[in-house]
Amino acid sequence: MNDQFIQGVIFDWDKIGKDSYLKGIRAFKGVEKLDFNKPITFFVGENGSGKSTLLEALAVAHGFNPEGGTKNYVFSTHDTHSELCDAIRIAKGYRKEKWGYFLRAESFYNVATQEEEYADITHPSAKYHEKSHGESFLALAQNNMNPNGLYLFDEPEAALSPQRQLTLLMQIYRCAKEGAQFIIVTHSPILLGIPDADIYCFDNGRIHLCEYEDTESYQVTEMFINNRQMLLDRLLTG
C-alpha cells in the first residue's frame, strides 16, 4: 500500500502556453503522470533535462516558498519559478506530513539568511553564516529533518564533501525509515546509492524508472575511477 504524503503528480499540458519553454523539454513530452511509491525518490539526468523544474513545481504546488524553506516562508528575492506548478495536480495520500522543507542549493544563502531573521527565543538561530558553506548547508538540512516530514531537496550534494554526503545519506535513510518522504534531485552517485529508492531518469527524451547502475552519475564515476589514465589520455591528448 502506498502511504506516501505525495503519491504522485498528474500533468495537464493544456494549461501551458504553446510558446512556453516547457514545451521544449523533451522529457516532459507525453508524460501524463508520475507515481511516488517509496519513501525516497530521486530525479536524475543531464543539466537542462527538467528535473529541477519539476521538483520546484511540486514544491510550489504543495505550498512551499519557491526559493526554499518551510511553508511559512514568505520572502522573495527573485521570482524565477515556472508556470509548471499551475499545470500539475498532486495526488496526496491519506497521511498528512507534520513538517516539511524545500532545500535548494542555488538559493541556500537567502534561505539561511531568512532562518536567522525568523529566529526567536523558542527557535534560536543556528547562525548558519558563521559556518563554512558545507557545514552550514548540512546543518540546515539536518536541523530541519524529522520523522513524518516531507522533504524536497534540489542538489543537496553541491556544497558537501564525499564524507558529508555519507552523513546526509545516513540521515535521509533514518528519517525515511521513521515515516518521512524525500524527493531529491541529485547528480551524486553517493546519495543515489541509498537502498530501496526509486530513481526517475530524465534522459533520452522521457521520464522513466531506472536502476542505480544505469544512471550516468554511477557509470561516469565508475569509468573515471577504474580507467582514469586511459580516460584522461583520450580527453586531453585526443
How should these model regions be labeled?
Residues 131-155, 163-175:
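GG-anchored amphipathic helix commonly corresponding to the ABC/SMC/Rad50 NBD signature/C-loop
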Residues 40-42, 53-117:
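ABC ATPase nucleotide-binding domain signature region
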Residues 46-47:
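The conserved Walker
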Residues 154, 184-185:
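Conserved D-loop beta-strand region of ABC ATPase nucleotide-binding domains
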Residues 1-32, 37:
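N-terminal pre-Walker A segment at the start of P-loop NTPase domains
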Residues 163-181, 188-238:
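C-terminal lobe/lid and adjacent interdomain/linker elements of RecA-like ASCE P-loop ATPase modules
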Residues 50:
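Conserved glycine(s) of the Walker
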